[in-house]
C-alpha cells in the first residue's frame, strides 16, 4: 500500500469483510461471532489501515450477520470510521449495492459502476423525500472529492513508463509459465476417423481467460 501510494496511485483495500468464499458470495450471509470477527476476519484490514492508510476501501458483496456489507452500519461507521478513524473513500464492489438509499445512509461514499441519469435522479428524489439527509450525502461527496484531489496532487510526482519493458516482461512471464505436454504413447495427433467426446460445460463454453479485472488484451 505504501509503495503504490508513494507513486501517487490510490490503493484500494478489499473486500471488506468476510468475503472468504467464492460460492454464492453475492448473497451469502456470513454469521460470525464478535471474537472470531475481530481475531480472524478484521485483523488484517485493521493492520493495513492503521499502518498504511489506504486511500480507499472496497466493501464486499456478501452479508455479514444479516446486513449487506455495502449498507452495514457496524462495519462502515462503528469499525471503520469511529474505531479505526478511517478517513478514506469507501466504495462498493462492482454492482455490489442492493439498496442505494440504505448504503448512503450507512456511510457508503461511491457506488461502482456509474449509472445513467435516472440513477442520480433517484438519489435526488430520495433527498427531496427525506429518505437521505442532505448532510449525509454531502459527507459522501466530500470523500469522493478528497480522493480526486489526492489524485490530482499525485500527478505532480515524476514518473517513467517504459511500455516496451512491460511488454517484454509479460511475454517472459507467459513463456515461463507455459506447460509443455509430453506426447506419451503417440496420443497426438489423434485419429481423424475417430470420435472424441469432450464432457462438461467448458466443452461448449471454453474459458480462455476470466472476465472483469483479470481480463487481458492479448494484443
Task: Go through each PLM region and give its residues.
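Glycoside hydrolase catalytic-domain context in secreted enzymes
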Residues: 1-219
Amino acid at each position: 500500500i505504501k509503495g503504490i501510494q508513494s507513486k501517487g496511485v490510490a490503493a484500494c483495500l478489499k473486500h471488506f469483510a468476510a468475503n472468504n468464499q467464492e460460492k454464492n458470495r453475492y448473497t451469502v450471509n456470513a454469521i460470525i461471532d464478535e471474537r472470531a470477527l475481530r481475531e480472524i476476519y478484521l485483523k488484517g484490514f485493521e493492520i493495513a489501515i492503521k499502518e498504511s492508510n489506504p486511500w480507499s476501501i472496497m466493501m464486499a458483496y456478501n452479508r455479514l450477520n444479516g446486513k449487506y456489507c455495502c449498507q452495514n452500519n457496524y462495519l462502515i461507521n462503528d469499525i471503520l470510521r469511529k474505531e479505526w478513524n478511517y478517513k478514506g473513500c469507501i466504495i462498493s464492489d462492482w454492482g455490489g449495492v442492493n439498496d442505494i438509499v440504505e448504503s448512503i445512509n450507512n456511510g457508503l461514499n461511491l457506488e461502482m459502476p456509474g449509472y445513467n441519469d435516472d440513477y442520480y435522479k433517484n438519489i435526488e428524489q430520495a433527498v427531496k423525500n427525506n429518505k437521505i439527509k442532505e448532510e449525509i450525502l454531502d459527507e459522501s461527496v466530500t470523500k469522493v472529492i478528497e480522493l480526486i484531489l489526492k489524485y490530482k496532487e499525485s500527478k505532480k510526482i515524476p514518473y517513467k513508463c517504459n511500455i516496451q519493458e512491460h511488454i517484454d516482461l509479460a511475454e517472459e512471464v507467459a513463456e515461463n509459465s507455459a506447460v509443455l505436454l509430453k506426447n506419451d504413447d503417440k496420443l497426438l495427433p489423434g485419429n481423424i476417423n475417430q470420435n472424441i467426446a469432450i464432457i462438461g460445460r467448458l466443452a461448449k463454453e471454453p474459458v480462455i481467460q476470466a472476465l472483469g479485472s483479470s481480463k487481458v488484451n492479448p494484443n
